[in-house]
Amino acid sequence: MIPRNFFFTILICPFNVCATFTAVATASPDCIGPFASYALFAFVTCICVCSIVCLVINFFQLVDWIFVRIAYLRHHPEYRNQNVAALLRLI
């Protein structure tokens, strides 16, 4: 079973981006000054970049987990350690 933290972090990143874009969409450009608009743009850019980085890291962790599971299951059954498998959530 795939650990739940992969799903949570995958869902949190798009949620943050959508919430940020929603907040920006309700901001009126006539009401804010130039500094505030640049600060808002920087905030949106940081949120998007951090979310993309988080998704990439999470993807690499998921791929690593899959390869560890495949390597563990390819071992002969007498060499499989159930404690290690439970710790890594491989079974």
Swiss-Prot record:
<comment type="function">
    <text>Down-regulates the EGF receptor.</text>
</comment>
<dbReference type="GO" id="GO:0044167">
    <property type="term" value="C:host cell endoplasmic reticulum membrane"/>
</dbReference>
<keyword id="KW-0244">Early protein</keyword>
<keyword id="KW-0812">Transmembrane</keyword>
<keyword id="KW-0732">Signal</keyword>
<dbReference type="Pfam" id="PF03376">
    <property type="entry name" value="Adeno_E3B"/>
</dbReference>
<protein>
    <recommendedName>
        <fullName>Early E3B 10.4 kDa protein</fullName>
    </recommendedName>
</protein>
<dbReference type="GO" id="GO:0016020">
    <property type="term" value="C:membrane"/>
</dbReference>
<feature type="transmembrane region" description="Helical">
    <location>
        <begin position="35"/>
        <end position="60"/>
    </location>
</feature>
<keyword id="KW-1038">Host endoplasmic reticulum</keyword>
<feature type="topological domain" description="Lumenal">
    <location>
        <begin position="23"/>
        <end position="34"/>
    </location>
</feature>
<dbReference type="InterPro" id="IPR005041">
    <property type="entry name" value="Adeno_E3B"/>
</dbReference>
<keyword id="KW-0472">Membrane</keyword>
<feature type="topological domain" description="Cytoplasmic">
    <location>
        <begin position="61"/>
        <end position="91"/>
    </location>
</feature>
<keyword id="KW-1043">Host membrane</keyword>
<comment type="similarity">
    <text>Belongs to the adenoviridae E3B family.</text>
</comment>
<feature type="signal peptide">
    <location>
        <begin position="1"/>
        <end position="22"/>
    </location>
</feature>
<keyword id="KW-1133">Transmembrane helix</keyword>
